[in-house]
Each structure stands twice: as structure tokens, then as C-alpha cells.
Amino acid sequence: MDHNHIPPTVRRTYGTDDLAKAASFAGGFINFGYWQGIDLTSPTPEDRVRSQEQLYRRVLRAFPEPREQLRLAEVGCGRGLGAALALREFRFASVTAVDIHPDQIERARAVNAKALASYPDRLAYTLGSAGELPFPDNSLDGLYSVEAAQHFRELTSFAAEAARVLRPGGRLVVTTFFTAPGAEIAERLKILLASFADGLDVAHPLDDFTTDLTGAGFTTVTTESIGPDVWPGLDRYLADTVPPAHWTRHFLTAWRDGLLDYHLITADRG
């Protein structure tokens, strides 16, 4: 997906609409959250922020020690809060955060101005796409993406680009929601969820992506369902922040019906 050809719904959602301002994404991290250990009796906006931070931590812990030596990049960084968290809490050697949307890069630089000043040589926000990453060959130790790959039009070029920019032995970590296989699944999701109907989200079967990764030269590809710690917590928070009939309440239904699930994927470059 060339950054000069952003799909209209992606351009609008992360441009003029600025999804981070929605109450359901309190805190600006723009992910569904990892709710393990959070009391769901009456979740607060602070709990929502914590859930989103925890999803980043779940991803970043997948990188091996000593992390202080690792040069990382994030694909689909949004407002860039996750990249700042990565440096602050995990002390990676450097993190370069990439997003296809120029408005998001502008916001990331503004929101994280203090972090950029604190880590002038270790934190950066730059324009780029999953299919054309702005890095030389073999230049990174790690690459990660948090709830962004569902917006990529296809994942084959992302897998190939990840393999290109990672050094041998480098690690890719991706988390987002993937679908069950089959054209009928994609059609059912379009009926249930407006984000699939309008093209914001793309139905990517999990098995197709793991095949792309092995085809690109990745080894030790592992997948883990983390849906039980994502969907119930998200839906409980949505119950207090959106109308009862809002389409986002159907994510829980889609998960329970086996149409999609939230996964954590790790893969090492051969």
C-alpha cells in the first residue's frame, strides 16, 4: 500500500475523523486492548488506557534479551505512543515508528515531542507503508505491528518487506485480528461489521499470513490466540461508551461465532 494511495476509508478514519478522539479509544493508542488482570465490573477510561498499554507490552516482551541492543521499527504506529512506551519501558537501542498517513506522523511528532527530545538519536517517526518500508536491507533487529495489519490491502508484500529489512535472526511480531478462511467468512463479516463493509478492515485469514511468512523466508512461525483477553474486555467497555445497537458490539459476536480472533504472531528471519 503506497503512502500516496491510501484507501479512502483509511485516509478519512485516521485523517479528518481522527479515530483516537473516539471515547472507545481513550488514551490515543488506538487498539482494542489486552484486558488480562483488569476488573471488568465497571471499567474506567484509565482502565481502557491500561488495556492498550498492556497490548503493547504483550508484543514487546516477545523480543529477546538483552533488549538494549535491539534496533526496532513499528509498522502502523498511529499517534506513536507505543513506540515511546517501547523506549521508556524496554530501553531498546532505537525505535523508528512508521505510518502511511501523513496526519498521523504529524500528530505522533507533536504528541511525543518530549520523548523525541529525551531520545533524539533513538526515537523517530517517519512516513512509509507496509509494502515499502523505509529501511535498508538487513538493518533491523526487530519489527512489530500492533493492530494495523487489518488495514493492509494484502500481507504478502508486508511479509517480504519484513524479511528484507530484518537481519538474519531478526524477529517479527504482529498482533491484530485475523479471520477464519473462506470467502463466505468475509461476506458474513461485511454484514456484521461496518469496518469490513466499507473497506477500512480487510479479511486476512491467519493461515494465509503464516504461509506468506514462511514463503518470505521466516522460520519458527508461531501463533497464539489472545482473544479471550481482548474481546470480552473490549465489549464490556463499549457497553458504557457506545449505543447498544452500535456495530462495534458485533466484534464479540464475530469472535464467539468463530469468524475472527485476535492473534499474536512471532516469526524469525532465516
Annotate each PLM feature:
Residues 156-171:
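A short glycine-rich, Lys/Arg-flanked "PGG" loop and its adjoining helix->strand segment in the class I
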Residues 201-217:
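Short alpha-helix
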Residues 1-27:
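N-terminal auxiliary segments of SAM/dcSAM-dependent transferases
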Residues 177-200:
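Short, glycine-/aromatic-enriched active-site segment of Class I SAM-dependent methyltransferases
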Residues 219-244:
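Conserved catalytic loop of SAM-dependent methyltransferase domains
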Residues 34, 50-69:
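Conserved alpha-helix/loop element of class I SAM-dependent methyltransferases that forms part
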Residues 131-142:
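A short acidic, Gly/Pro-enriched loop at the edge of an enzyme's catalytic core
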Residues 73-132:
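Class I SAM-dependent methyltransferase SAM/SAH-binding core
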